[in-house]
């Protein structure tokens, strides 16, 4: 039993010496620095949570707007597809009903800006494709054959025409009545 008391005393002495080696001022400074860092991290965490909340709200708003605009664009594309399909059908019907007149029609080039208009382009006008060519394509843009690319191209804008026209455009019956 005496040995146990001396062992406890030896271990107690050892522990007390180790504790005396540690500077309590340094330990308190470390604890104070850790509390200060903890406060800063908590504030930063709160700011990040607020930022994430605002970002999520803004993301939801932008996602809704993006979805709305995407739906609008898809609807517009469908509408344009329907319009161009109807145009191709009408061109096909006109080509079958009036093949000679349809082949004589010249379409002026589409100009992006009126300032770029050059009247010399009329002589190199493009012709509208036949109904077989326009219905084969799934393209939503009108089919146009370039005069330079077509070997069978005949420049009809210089030849006298049986149908009345103004600036290369064939006049309708109503326009003829108004012009007389």
From Swiss-Prot:
One of its GO terms (cellular component) is BORC complex. Its main location: membrane. Keywords: Lysosome, Membrane. Residues 130-144, 158-170 have a biased composition (Polar residues). Residues 130-180 are annotated as: Disordered. Associates with the BLOC-1 complex. As part of a BORC-like complex may play a role in lysosomes movement and localization at the cell periphery. Associated with the cytosolic face of lysosomes, this complex may couple lysosomes to microtubule plus-end-directed kinesin motor. May also be involved in the biogenesis of lysosome-related organelles such as melanosomes. This is KxDL motif-containing protein 1. It comes from Xenopus laevis. The gene is kxd1.
């Amino acid at each position: 039993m005496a040995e146990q008391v001396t062992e406890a005393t030896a271990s107690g002495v050892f522990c007390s010496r180790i504790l005396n080696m540690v500077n309590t001022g340094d330990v308190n400074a470390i604890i104070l620095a850790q509390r200060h860092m903890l406060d800063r991290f908590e504030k930063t965490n709160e700011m990040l949570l607020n930022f994430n909340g605002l970002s999520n709200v803004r993301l939801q708003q932008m996602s809704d707007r993006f979805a709305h605009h995407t739906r609008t664009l898809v609807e517009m594309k469908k509408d344009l597809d329907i319009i161009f399909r109807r145009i191709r059908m009408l061109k096909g019907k006109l080509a079958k009903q009036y093949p000679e007149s349809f082949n004589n029609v010249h379409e002026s080039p589409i100009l992006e800006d009126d300032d770029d208009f050059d009247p010399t382009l009329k002589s190199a006008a493009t012709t509208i494709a036949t109904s077989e060519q326009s219905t084969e394509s799934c393209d939503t843009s009108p089919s146009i054959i370039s005069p330079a690319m077509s070997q069978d191209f005949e420049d009809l804008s210089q030849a006298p025409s049986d149908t009345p026209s103004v600036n290369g455009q064939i006049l309708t019956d109503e326009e003829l009545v108004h012009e007389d």
